[in-house]
Amino acid sequence: MEISILFLPLAASIISGFFGKYIGDRNSELVTSILVSISAILSIFVLYQVIFNQYEENIVIATWINSGSLDVNWSMLIDPLSAVMLVVVTSVSSLVHIYSIGYMSHDPHKPRFMAYLSLFTFAMLMLVTSDNFLQLFFGWEGVGLCSYFLIGFWFKKESANTAAIKAFVVNRVGDFGFALGIFLIFYLFGTVNYDEVFQQVPSMTAAGVTPFLDKELVFLGINFRAVDLICLLLFIGAMGKSAQILLHTWLPDAMEGPTPVSALIHAATMVTAGVFLVVRCSPIYEYSEPVSYTHLRAHETRG
């Protein structure tokens, strides 16, 4: 059932994207809306199980990378946080799909639009159910790519093309910081799996253990504790996706896309990805003292 939640939107995207011209506009709309709605219903059932039966599971779908010390599976992590996000993403997406049937009724490219919506949903689900930072990053980039497709859907409008490129480029700035944060995590912890990373953080602060959290690293000429630098780099990624100050300029222009796109990206899905990242990494953020951010602001003021 859990795997169906993830792959139903992908199946909807493939059917509408590759076979839309054969099955027709109406069938493309129905297939995508129905499959995503089924995914939403199953997500609600999973959330019920998590809340009332304390259900938690890490479902391994496939072995992804096994090279040296890097061992990464494509997994589906079900816990309270991911269960809530499953409901948020699929319920909002299903409503947007249904609304799009009427809103896009006069558009000649309806199957392509519905395929993009479903693919965006799949990428977002891949993001929120990841059990490691690498899968999270791939879902993160998938969401960014789909947002580019959706914002620039009306490609004959120059303003839509400009807005799509702007959103894509600005988000890549944040994603670069996010990628550096993942590289640093692997360098310091030797793994990108959530459980292994989160378990090591407190153990490395125990008496008699090398004070990992006090290890000084230099980034852009500024000395950071290792954990503070990790949190800063991850937060830069969150700033891009959640359109926070300095990396927020893409958001107003993104309104150039069809209204359902604005609802899907801005209301409750893509912009929550940054918040999700910070919450998911809270076991690391717990060991990053707020004073480090005060020092950072002081350096910015001096600059």
In which residue ranges do the predicted regions lie?
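...captures the hydrophobic TM-helix bundle architecture rather than a specific catalytic motif
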Residues: M1-R297, R302
